[in-house]
Amino acid sequence: MKSALKKSILAVFMLCFATQAWAVKAKIRFLFPVSTKNVTDGFENAELRTSEFVLAFLLPVSRNTQLGLGYSYFNARIEDPTSSSEGYKGIFRAHLMELGAGYSGFELTRNISLLFDASVRIPVSGQAEVKGNQDSAEASSISGMGYFFGPGVAYGKMEIILFYQRRNLSFDNLTVLRKGKRQDVALHSTEYGLGLGYTF
């Protein structure tokens, strides 16, 4: 599916979702990984640094259950160790559509409740660039899948969540030259961390 078509489908879905009478809430969430396990094809000896935020429209299906349709922006950077002769640096950006559900029916007090969120993330578009001492490459076509879930605590409109997420993203025709051989570049990450959210 072409990138432009993916963007159009995402825009139509979010517009229709947001204009429904039920969709009276939106949520923004920032994710802060605490523990990560990353394997980046083509950068096996380097550490991937990531950041991400999520904006979602919420559709109540019952008093304590909500469906969510949202947008996730993912950004990552990676760099070869100084001992590497290739000297590659990589920048990756991805725009993902999020489909999920949340439950917040476990009330601890009048204003505090436990919640649980789960979602899948489908890449819609992305850009990536790798630069080395001898060559460089760019890509604007992305594929893969992501998963997210975790328990948390909601206090009024604020929430704190302990999350687990897994992400597998590949960029078409993005390669690096290692020991005279071309290697495809792809991101595989598992993260545990803290999420801060606000519903408005």
Q: What name fits each language-model region?
A:
Residues 1-25:
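Cleavable N-terminal export/targeting peptides
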Residues 26-32, 67-71, 99-101, 116-118, ...:
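Membrane-embedded beta-strand positions of outer-membrane beta-barrel proteins
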Residues 22-77, 197-199:
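Short glycine/proline- and aromatic-enriched beta-strand/turn motifs that initiate or cap beta-hairpins
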Residues 30-38, 71-77, 103-105, 120-126, ...:
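Transmembrane beta-strands of outer-membrane beta-barrel pores
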Residues 80, 147-200:
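Predominantly the C-terminal beta-signal and adjacent terminal strand-loop region
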Residues 34-47, 72-94, 124-143, 170-187:
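Flexible, solvent-exposed loop segments that connect beta-strands
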